[in-house]
């Protein structure tokens, strides 16, 4: 039986998030510049988006560019921004054809103006698509997100819009970048690293983690299916005992 046929379609994770890691090391192994790894990594993105859409996964969030990534060499950052623009232009028809909605989270105003415009244009064009919501985390850091959330709520408390006693999880959720997304069910990280890297710290509270040694450029639909099969074999207890769930 193929790995895809082992997936139970009635128990799919509603929200998959991926830390796409290993582009640079993949390129280095082949004696290439890091840029080459990023270009190949863009093809892996297409594979995973197609795989999620075909299965019926409703939400996919990709860690595309962190707040810390601005500290990388200037040429690499410029190349990543150019690659983002070209990918958006190239894939807009595919997104529309497959009923995929593009979303973005992060401090988007920090993006170069051309990138921001292209991104917001595609988001507007695809806003009514329903099959899959593809969220790109760009200029994103979870601590930055939480600081922004606290500031927003603090202003509302100061202006008597929100009472401090009424602040709960739902209020915090409403002020996060991910306010319209469900919590993450499955978090995947490629390249063998086993850390979170300041990604969706609030939203992964009950997520199942899946780490693979595969570098991101080599990550195909089959590896996605393998991660989902592994996820479906786990017992998600949310603080309860196995006996309570049975």
Predicted features and spans:
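Flexible, compositionally biased loop and terminal segments
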Residues: 1-246
């Amino acid at each position: 039986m193929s790995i895809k046929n082992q997936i139970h379609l009635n128990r799919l994770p509603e929200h998959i998030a991926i830390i796409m890691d290993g582009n640079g090391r993949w390129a280095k192994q082949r004696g290439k510049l890091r840029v080459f790894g990023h270009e190949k990594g863009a093809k892996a993105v297409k594979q995973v988006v197609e795989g999620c859409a075909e299965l019926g996964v409703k939400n996919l969030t990709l860690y595309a560019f962190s707040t810390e990534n601005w500290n990388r060499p200037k040429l690499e950052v410029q190349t990543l921004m150019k690659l983002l623009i070209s990918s958006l232009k190239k894939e807009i028809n595919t997104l529309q054809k497959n009923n995929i909605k593009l979303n973005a989270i992060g401090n988007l105003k920090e993006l170069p103006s051309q990138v921001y415009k292209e991104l917001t244009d595609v988001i507007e064009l695809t806003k009514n698509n329903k099959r899959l919501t593809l969220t790109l985390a760009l200029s994103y850091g979870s601590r930055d997100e939480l600081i922004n959330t606290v500031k927003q709520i603090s202003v509302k408390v100061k202006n008597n819009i929100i009472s401090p006693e009424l602040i709960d999880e739902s209020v915090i959720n409403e002020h996060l970048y991910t306010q319209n997304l469900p919590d993450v069910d499955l978090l995947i990280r490629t390249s063998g690293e086993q850390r979170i890297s300041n990604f969706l710290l609030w939203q992964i509270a009950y997520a199942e983690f899946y780490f693979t040694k595969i570098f991101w450029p080599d990550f195909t639909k089959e590896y996605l299916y393998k991660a989902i099969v592994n996820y479906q074999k786990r017992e998600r207890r949310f603080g309860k005992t196995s006996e309570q769930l049975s």
